[in-house]
Structure formats: C-alpha cells, structure tokens
C-alpha cells in the first residue's frame, strides 16, 4: 500500500495533532463523489495539456490511470485508509501509486476549493435526475389511480371539515400537481447551476488552467462560472437543492397524513396492500401504514437539514471556509432518505384500494351539498348574501331535526323561506353537484379527465429531463463539445 498523500505542509514544522487529524478527516460517506472527482481530474488533465504542463504521453498516462482508478474504486478493489484526509488525498494517493511523480503534476493549477465545488455540482446534477425519476414513479402511480376514479365521488374538506363533494381522481391529482412543480424545480435548478467552478482554483482563478470555458464543456456544463470567488464560495446550489428535496418531503407528507387517516377504521376509505403494511408485536389485528408514517416522520429530518445548513451559511465571509464541508452532511442524509422513501411511497400509492361505496356514502354527509342550495337560489336572482343566509337557515333546520339535507321534504321548504321551491331538492344530487363544477381545472368528471391528459403532457417533459444526460460532456461526448468551443 502506498504512503498517504498530504496536499499541504511545507510551511509547517510539524504535522497536525491526532485530534485535528480526526476532526479534519472526511466521513466515509463523502467518498461517494469519486466519479465526479475523477471526471474533474480528466477535464483538468486536458487543461494542463493545453497549457503545456503535460505532454501527450503524460496526458495519456494520467487519463489511463484515472480510468483504472475509477474502475478499481467502483469495484471495491481500492478503498480509503484511515490516513486519507479526504477524497482528494485518497485519489491522489492511488494516482501516485500508479504513476509516481507524474501523478503529482495533476495538482498544478487547481485547488481543493474548486475541486470540491465542482464535485458537489456534478453530483447534484446527477441526483436531480435520479431523484426526479423516483418522484415520477409516484406521479405515475397517482395518475393511474386518478384515471380509475374520475367518477368516484368523495367528500372534499376544508379545515378538516366536510366542505363539498369532489371526484377522488381530482383530489389525487391535486397531490400530483404539487409534485409536478417539484419536478419542474429540479429542472429549473439544473439550468440555473449549469456553470462549472473548475478553474477558479483557490479563489482568484488559475494561473495555469486558463480555459475554464473548455473544461466546463468537457464536464457537461454550458459555461464556466462568471466569478472565481463566487465559484468556490457559493453554496446556494446546495441550499436550493435541499429546499426542493424538503418540499418533495412535505408534499409527500401531506398525502401520507391522509393515507394514515383514510386507512384507519374510523374512516375505512382505503385499504393498504399487505406488502406496504406491517403488524403489531402484541396486537394481532393491527395493519399499520408504516410507509406513510415513516415518510411523514422523515420529512422533519429534511426540513431540519435545510434549516441547519442555512444557519451554517449565514455568517460565512468570502471566499472558501472549512465550514462549507458541512454541506455534504446535510446533502447526503437528505438524498439517502429520499432514495429510501420514493420507491416505497410509489409502491404504496400504486397498490391502494379505495372503497368506492364507502366514499360515496360519506360524500353528502356534513351538509356538503349546501352550496348547491345557495347556487340554486342565485340562479333565481336571489343575491348571494341572502342566498347564503337562507342556506344557513336550511342547515339549521336540518340540524335541529337530526337529519341531513337528504331528509328535507317539499313541505319543509316554505316554512324555512318562501323563496325555496320543491324543485330545489332536485339540485341535491351528487352527480349534478359534480357536473356543475365544470370550469377549467374543476372537479367535474370530464374536466378531471382533461386535467389528467394535460398533466401527462407536462410529466413527459419532466421525464425527458430525468432521463437525459448532464449536458454534452461530463461522462460522455465531451470531446466534440470542447472542439466546438475552440472553434468559437
């Protein structure tokens, strides 16, 4: 095994204390960025060749060694040792073992500051696509369920109180719409941070690697960062990514809360599949909504990660500070949580079985059709303020007699208000109430079907992002992009 590599030390008389070394050592989880670090090294090697630091044979040797290192690390044949301070020292140790002093040439003109900034951006651009795929699986499950239930009526709620009847598919698509915006945020994020920090070096820019625009294209970015200080000091790409992930978690948590309620015996609106439920160690009858509960609980962790990271950033002067290393602790936990949650949640949603008859039975309860009374009166030129009062009197009449609107008779109406006629009772039908809500985006069954069709078109755009490459380089197609940049 080769000796550990240290990237600094010439101006020090002694090495770091054991306590400092332990504090400085990167957690093992940080080494997951090895592919991004090696991609950056390949691009930087091209820069050094352009600058005349590497000749053709040296460049080829370094590129070949980097490919071998990537394969060996990926296969588990090479692993960090305790003395490796971080990912950069680990990979340089492996490079030096293969190439000797030639491996040390790769360090010219770059800093760990721009390396780590680049690693994080590349990694997050990849994860934006991978996490999007997980969210899309949930979207597809929601859309399939909604398509099955464009005629299924249920009570809609405000303030957790029965409000108006709605179509179950409409309710499910409301959740799908919020997750769609999260997917669009991932794509927007990617466009905003499609800039390479490589070439910024420590903070002032490199005196050797002077074509960061070319290395940017090698890595799949559209361009290099506009300001070298900002390139190494900025972590708003991390904060925004954490925010998007926390929004995904919150959106899932809201649906999870409903599933917990709806699957309870008090509601019995939905049945959970056995493969996405657990039992009790003492109560044999229990069937618990663990996926929903764990999702709801883990959302708090993700909210805490974005709040904690912003607190770390708030008092940090330019440019790079070691505090910035904390970005990975928050990022990796957030990403790891979502990677566990998303497939489980998609499976749970896709296997839900709704009790259509129970939902229909509950739909008119709690005077959910009261708005139909007010609308019927407005249709007969009664001002809405008065219609509202009359409808309230109708509800009070029913409550005092212990029945819902379905218990009203033609004989009851004149005694409540002379403007109420027997034909009003015909408006108190669930299907009519749904059909009357037929504006754009409303709950009428045909409008829900139209909404689903539009949604599928929008989701296809998100699928194109999730399944697409990172720019034109990074891990493929870099040569053609760089040649085009040289011609420009």
Swiss-Prot record:
Pathway involvement of the protein, from the record: Amino-acid biosynthesis; L-arginine biosynthesis; L-arginine from L-ornithine and carbamoyl phosphate: step 3/3
Reactions catalysed according to its record: 2-(N(omega)-L-arginino)succinate = fumarate + L-arginine
Listed GO CC annotations: cytosol
Primary location recorded for the protein, binned into one broad class: cytoplasm
GO biological process: arginine biosynthetic process via ornithine; L-arginine biosynthetic process
One Pfam family per UniProt: Lyase_1
Keywords, alphabetical: Amino-acid biosynthesis, Arginine biosynthesis, Cytoplasm, Lyase, Plasmid
Enzyme nomenclature, EC number: 4.3.2.1
Cellular localization per UniProt: Cytoplasm
Molecular function, one GO term: argininosuccinate lyase activity
Top-rank taxon, per record: Bacteria
Family of the protein in this entry: Belongs to the lyase 1 family. Argininosuccinate lyase subfamily.
Protein name: Argininosuccinate lyase 2
Gene, per the UniProt record: argH2
């Amino acid at each position: 095994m080769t000796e550990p590599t240290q990237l600094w030390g010439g101006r020090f008389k002694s090495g770091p204390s054991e306590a400092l070394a332990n504090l400085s050592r990167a957690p093992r989880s940080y080494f997951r960025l090895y592919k991004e670090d090696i991609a950056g090294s390949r691009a930087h090697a091209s820069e050094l060749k352009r600058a005349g630091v590497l000749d053709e044979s040296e460049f080829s040797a370094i590129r070949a060694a980097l490919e071998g290192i990537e394969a060996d690390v990926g296969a588990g044949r090479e692993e960090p040792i305790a003395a490796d301070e971080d990912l950069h020292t680990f990979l340089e140790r492996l490079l030096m073992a293969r190439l000797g002093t030639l491996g040390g040439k790769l360090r010219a003109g770059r800093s760990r500051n721009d390396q780590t900034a680049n690693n994080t951006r590349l990694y997050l651009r990849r994860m934006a696509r991978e996490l999007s795929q997980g969210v899309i699986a949930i979207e597809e499950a929601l859309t399939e369920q909604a398509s099955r239930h464009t005629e299924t009526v249920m009570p809609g709620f405000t303030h957790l109180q029965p409000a108006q009847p709605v179509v179950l598919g409409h309710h499910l698509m409301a959740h799908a719409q919020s997750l769609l915006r999260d997917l669009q945020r991932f794509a927007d994020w990617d466009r905003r941070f499609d800039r390479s920090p490589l070439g910024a070096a420590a903070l002032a820019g490199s005196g050797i690697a002077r074509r960061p625009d070319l290395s940017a294209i090698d890595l799949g970015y559209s361009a290099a960062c506009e300001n070298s200080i900002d390139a190494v000091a900025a972590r708003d790409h991390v904060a925004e990514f954490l925010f998007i992930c926390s929004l995904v978690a919150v959106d899932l948590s809201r649906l999870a809360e409903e599933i917990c309620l709806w699957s309870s015996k008090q509601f019995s609106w939905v049945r959970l599949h056995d493969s996405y439920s657990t039992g009790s160690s003492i109560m044999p009858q229990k069937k618990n909504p663990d996926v929903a509960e764990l999702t709801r609980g883990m959302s708090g962790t993700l909210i805490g990660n974005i709040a904690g990271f912003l607190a770390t950033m708030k008092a940090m002067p330019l440019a790079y500070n070691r505090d910035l290393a904390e970005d990975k602790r928050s990022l990796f936990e957030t990403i790891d949580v979502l990677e566990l949650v998303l497939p489980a949640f998609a499976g749970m949603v896709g296997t839900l079985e709704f009790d259509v008859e129970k939902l229909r039975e509950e739909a008119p309860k709690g005077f959910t059709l009261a708005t139909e009374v007010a609308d019927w009166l407005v249709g007969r030129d009664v001002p809405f303020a008065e219609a509202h009062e009359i409808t309230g009197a109708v509800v009070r009449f029913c409550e005092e007699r212990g029945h819902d609107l379905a218990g009203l008779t033609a004989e009851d109406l004149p005694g409540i208000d002379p403007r109420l006629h027997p034909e009003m009772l015909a408006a108190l039908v669930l299907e009519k109430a749904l059909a009357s809500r037929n504006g754009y985006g409303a709950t009428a069954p045909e409008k829900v079907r139209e909404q689903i069709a539009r949604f599928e078109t929008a989701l296809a755009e998100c699928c194109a992002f999730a399944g697409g490459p990172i720019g034109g380089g990074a891990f493929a197609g870099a040569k053609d992009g760089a040649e085009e940049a040289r011609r420009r």
